[in-house]
Amino acid sequence: MALQPESPGQPASTVDPAEIAKFSKLSAEWWDPTGRMAPLHRINPLRISFIRDAACRKFERNAKSLSCLEGLRMLDIGCGAGLLCEPFTRLGAQVIGIDPSATNIAAAKLHADKSHLAIDYRNVMVEEIDPRERFDIVLAMEVIEHVTDVGAFLSRCAALMKPTGIMVVATLNRNWKSFALAIVGAEYVMRWLPRGTHQWDKFVTPAELEQHLNRLKLIVTEQSGLVFNPLADRWKLSPDMDVNYMMVAEAAP
């Protein structure tokens, strides 16, 4: 998406500079660790390490290697502006990031271009991915609480996994604690998220998620909660899955 200088014999660029400016502003917001996306930036290192370590255990890689995911195909569903796509590309994975928001994809492409990273970003829904495409790692991070049919969505995700692949899902538990912290606390008190970002009745309990996965002949191999410590102002992995949690699933033997 970079603008090229006009030269004799070269047609003028058809890219609208105003659009570039708009996408640049959005990209800066997504990637500003102190701005509106600060909560996501705080939790992102934990998501990255959890996914990386799970993948390295599955595929017998050295998690300390800077190219530990080399040769692995990864699909990030609902990728936003690429906060997961970029670090996993740097670790060697061949990453495809998809998002139904054209604006998010434009911002993601712009930031990847500035970072000199080759990432295949697509403005599509998971249902539009060619079923012949298969991936070693399928990510559905903070997505299922926004879909209309969790079972159908996960079925489509599972269909895109290689037989030896893994799926990593992150979402929010459904209980009064998650209502108090993820909605009242995050959206109304702390104002980390715009009001209305989440609907509590669309949250998914760990038992429900595991049931969906089991119906698809997948088994949960790893799971972890993510807990925020307000005194330390940081997130940590925890056995406590009352609010935020992640699961790794693979094909049942």
UniProtKB/Swiss-Prot annotation:
MF annotations from Gene Ontology: 2-polyprenyl-6-hydroxyphenol methylase activity; 3-demethylubiquinol 3-O-methyltransferase activity; polyprenyldihydroxybenzoate methyltransferase activity
SUPFAM superfamilies assigned: S-adenosyl-L-methionine-dependent methyltransferases
A Pfam family: Methyltransf_23
Pathway note: Cofactor biosynthesis; ubiquinone biosynthesis
Keywords in alphabetical order: Methyltransferase, S-adenosyl-L-methionine, Transferase, Ubiquinone biosynthesis
Signal sequence annotation: none
Keyword Lyase: no
Enzyme class: transferase
Catalytic activity from the UniProt record: a 3-demethylubiquinol + S-adenosyl-L-methionine = a ubiquinol + S-adenosyl-L-homocysteine + H(+); a 3-(all-trans-polyprenyl)benzene-1,2-diol + S-adenosyl-L-methionine = a 2-methoxy-6-(all-trans-polyprenyl)phenol + S-adenosyl-L-homocysteine + H(+)
InterPro entries tied to this protein: SAM-dependent_MTases_sf, UbiG_MeTrfase
Gene3D superfamilies linked: Vaccinia Virus protein VP39
Top-rank taxon, per record: Bacteria
Transferase found in the keyword field: yes
Gene Ontology terms: biological process: methylation
Binding site for S-adenosyl-L-methionine: R47, G78, D99, M141
EC annotation from Swiss-Prot or TrEMBL: 2.1.1.222, 2.1.1.64
Function summary: O-methyltransferase that catalyzes the 2 O-methylation steps in the ubiquinone biosynthetic pathway.
Family to which the UniProt record says this protein belongs: Belongs to the methyltransferase superfamily. UbiG/COQ3 family.
Protein name: Ubiquinone biosynthesis O-methyltransferase
Species of provenance: Rhodopseudomonas palustris (strain TIE-1)
Gene it is expressed from: ubiG
